[in-house]
Amino acid sequence: MKRPDYRTLQALDAVIRERGFERAAQKLCITQSAVSQRIKQLENMFGQPLLVRTVPPRPTEQGQKLLALLRQVELLEEEWLGDEQTGSTPLLLSLAVNADSLATWLLPALANVLSDSPIRLNLQVEDETRTQERLRRGEVVGAVSIQPQALPSCLVDQLGALDYLFVASKEFAQRYFPNGVTRSALLKAPVVAFDHLDDMHQAFLQQNFDLPPGSVPCHIVNSSEAFVQLARQGTTCCMIPHLQIEKELNSGELIDLTPGLFQRRMLYWHRFAPESRMMRRVTDALIDYGHKVLRQD
């Protein structure tokens, strides 16, 4: 069995993290030539390329597997060192999460773990349809995803669902939907998406109003909190998690434009196996809190 030298693996990791050989060399305090030599040594060991030398570089499938292995080893090693050394550097946990979970339930779920454990979070925000890919590539050690199937050598548990409502302010509804929400009225009503890959509102409008993708005016805003602000100020109608706007709905500041119609996103927690003790604490916290505040039916 081929056993990689973790010093050479760290060179591969640095090139991916720093998005290039020059910055990787600066990060590792070695020359650019030394970085290239270490990666070539790894590639010779495994008999195949580990990097696609694009700008920025990206790992091959085998490179992704090695980076995932490095994440597991680093996590277990740092936890062990934490047991052996007092005052050691807090354990770094890199997690991939979707913006809506971050804006609603995830931080409260981790509050106790963060307050009484020596850890540092590195939260990487990504759409819930793509967070699992970050775990596959070895960029993170855990991911909140809509994918129900675990990756090889990983574990998965169901967290619960976020229900997304199609909402707007009363003023917006009066302006764009004086006769109710109809297909023709929707063609003129601006919506908002998180990025160009966010198709939630498109799927909702196509499923319920037979509107093809791209048929309504759409803003692009990379912020869950900004969705709420845009809806409150009457700029757009939005797909927003019910959990995020309970107060606004109860006060009447926002209204559900299509009562009884919603988009449900079931969320799952993925992480490497075996779990370290600290990751087990994170897992328990996310599952316990998720089962309390997310839809379970």
Swiss-Prot record:
SUPFAM superfamilies membership: Periplasmic binding protein-like II, Winged helix' DNA-binding domain
Domain named HTH lysR-type: residues: 4-60
DNA-binding annotation, residue ranges on this chain: 21-40
Listed PROSITE patterns: HTH_LYSR (PS50931)
Key words, A-Z: DNA-binding, Transcription, Transcription regulation
Gene3D superfamilies the record matches: 3.40.190.290, Winged helix-like DNA-binding domain superfamily/Winged helix DNA-binding domain
Pfam families attached to this UniProt entry: HTH_1, LysR_substrate
InterPro entries according to UniProt: ArgP, ArgP_gammaproteobact, LTTR, LysR_subst-bd, Tscrpt_reg_HTH_LysR, WH-like_DNA-bd_sf, WH_DNA-bd_sf
Single GO MF annotation: DNA-binding transcription factor activity
NCBIfam families (UniProt xref): argP, PRK03635.1, PRK13348.1
Family membership: Belongs to the LysR transcriptional regulatory family.
Function (record text): Controls the transcription of genes involved in arginine and lysine metabolism.
Subunit structure: Homodimer.
Protein name, as recorded: HTH-type transcriptional regulator ArgP
Native source organism of the sequence: Klebsiella pneumoniae subsp. pneumoniae (strain ATCC 700721 / MGH 78578)
Origin organism lineage: Bacteria, Pseudomonadati, Pseudomonadota, Gammaproteobacteria, Enterobacterales
Gene that produces this protein: argP
